[in-house]
């Protein structure tokens, strides 16, 4: 129940990086129950960023996409790596990398432009891109790299402030 309470609490637009990661950990607990612990997850997090405020529900849709689209039609154990790093003293980047089926280049363009639709509704990559760009005023905030058949990495960059 904690996953749904945390992720759907609509009273708050921003949360700390730590809280966003807690949502991911709760989500992955549910997923690994469903998929019989077939997905391992590694966190590479700059501890200095844990109390930084960020727009809510940036990482969760990326992880959900990696699990549901990246793992489809792929044999073997799923692997995810979630990274939270400072790019400089004003920009940070969160990323999700999977060892799934990958995405062809033409499909990446469609996803980022909002022209790719799946049968499933909800927060998609284009929605994350729009929300981040609107909230932070950053163009091209989301990028996708992929090697079809091997991996996909989605990176989201945005500005941050530290106290002091």
PLM features per residue range, with description:
Residues 1-145, 151-155:
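Two-component histidine phosphotransfer core
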Residues 108, 163-164:
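Acidic, low-complexity intrinsically disordered linear regions enriched in Asp/Glu with Ser/Thr/Pro
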Residues 156-162:
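C-terminal beta-strand of the catalytic ATP-binding
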